[in-house]
Design a protein with these regions (language model features):
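Surface-exposed, charged secondary-structure patches
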Residues: 113-161
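Short beta-strand edge/turn micro-motifs at domain boundaries
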Residues: 2, 34-44, 164-193
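Hydrophobic core residues within well-ordered beta-strands of beta-rich domains
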Residues: 65, 150, 167-169
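A mature extracytoplasmic/lumenal domain signature
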Residues: 108, 135-137, 154-158, 171, ...
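Juxtamembrane and targeting peptides
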Residues: 2-81
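Core segments of small alpha/beta cavity-forming domains
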Residues: 45-123
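Glycine-centered tight beta-turn/hairpin loop motif at sheet-sheet or coil-to-beta transitions
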Residues: 98, 161-164
């Protein structure tokens, strides 16, 4: 059989084309991977809170419950939210509420009040610039009527127009039958921690 000799120029060109394609493919795959990582990292706080699975990953302590509640507060009053985002965040917020608080604040009523409060904050140009949360070791705790209670202080540092002010709230939480701490109610207080 007769075998035709390979042209060295053609072989060299084919090898160069394959090398360029291989190197180009590597860099393209790397670039796409970096873009995907950036997309995952660049979620807003609103998106992160909306995606929280509180049914499966409920916070383990009363303080952790209030940390999530405070993150929600900052979003309500500091971010420009759509109606859908407000509703989704309110639904997440209500997962932190005790049954008694839910009875007094059905979802639709809660969302309506929340929208009015957000609008009031926006008109007054009030934003939350920082939040202080009492340490769990310093919290008031008690057992009463077969329930465990935990009271924690939260300080909200607000920017109002050109000035600043601080408001303190006392949150009352109760542990439910599943061992989950839920917000029973809160009130404005002069106490600080």
């Amino acid at each position: 059989m007769y075998k035709k000799a390979q042209n060295p120029v053609v072989v060299t060109i084919v090898m160069i084309v394959l090398a360029v394609a291989l190197i180009g493919g590597f860099f393209l795959a790397r670039h796409i991977g970096e873009k995907n990582r950036e997309t995952r990292k660049s979620k807003t706080e609103v998106e992160k809170l909306m995606e929280l699975d509180l049914d499966e990953n409920y916070p383990g302590t009363a303080r952790e419950v209030l940390k999530i509640n405070n993150r929600l507060m900052k979003c309500y009053y500091n971010e420009e939210l759509t109606d859908e985002q407000i509703k989704a965040l309110a639904m997440q917020n209500q997962k932190l509420f005790d049954e008694e608080l839910l009875k007094r604040n059905p979802y639709d009523v809660y969302v309506g009040r929340l929208k009015k409060e957000i609008e009031s904050y926006k008109k007054s140009k009030v934003t939350i610039i920082n939040i202080g949360l009492q340490e769990l070791a310093d919290a008031e705790t008690e057992e009463k009527g077969g329930y465990k209670f935990c009271n924690l202080l939260v300080s909200y540092f607000l920017k109002e127009g050109n000035g600043h002010k601080k408001t303190n709230h006392k949150y009352y939480l109760r542990e439910d039958e599943n061992g989950k701490w839920k917000i029973l109610f809160w009130e404005v207080t002069t106490k600080t921690f």
